[in-house]
Amino acid sequence: MMVLDKEDGVPMLSVQPKGKQKGCAGCNRKIKDRYLLKALDQYWHEDCLKCACCDCRLGEVGSTLYTKANLILCRRDYLRLFGTTGNCAACSKLIPAFEMVMRARDNVYHLDCFACQLCNQRFCVGDKFFLKNNMILCQMDYEEGQLNGTFDSHVQ
């Protein structure tokens, strides 16, 4: 398991077998359980290391947790509160980090914006699309542009 502080990305959490009893950073009681968690240079009961927002047990939701602004967070809540992926290449609006996106080369798009930029046809899974002059094109518009000489013959 890992803790990531997005500012430095340092892995900091491991599951360790119980040795000498340690005090829990969450409840301040001795840890008598067989296993304990170590995060942020402190020891925790498995039940005490929880997301500050949704209260989920961080040892159960994955192998990564995040810290920021003195909060310990699961991935979902960290991204909801602090994350962004950048701007959509089609509409230029901000894309929240937790939102599903489509990517074409270095461009990132909202799912609703991932469409042919000439005819606005949305793509389905498996549809062929072309990236030409940094524009997303359906096969029909791309081929028409090739026939009309709008594009050179090299597909990007």
From Swiss-Prot:
Gene Ontology MF terms: DNA-binding transcription factor binding; metal ion binding; transcription coactivator activity
Any one of the GO BP annotations: positive regulation of transcription by RNA polymerase II
One Gene Ontology term, aspect cellular component: nucleus
Keyword Transmembrane appears in the UniProt entry: no
A Pfam match: LIM
Keywords: LIM domain, Metal-binding, Nucleus, Repeat, Zinc
Tissue specificity annotation: Expressed in the brain and not in the thymus.
Residue intervals of the LIM zinc-binding domain: 22-84, 86-148
Name of the molecule in the record: Rhombotin-1
Lineage of producing organism: Eukaryota, Metazoa, Chordata, Craniata, Vertebrata
Location of the protein in the cell: Nucleus
Function: May be involved in gene regulation within neural lineage cells potentially by direct DNA binding or by binding to other transcription factors.
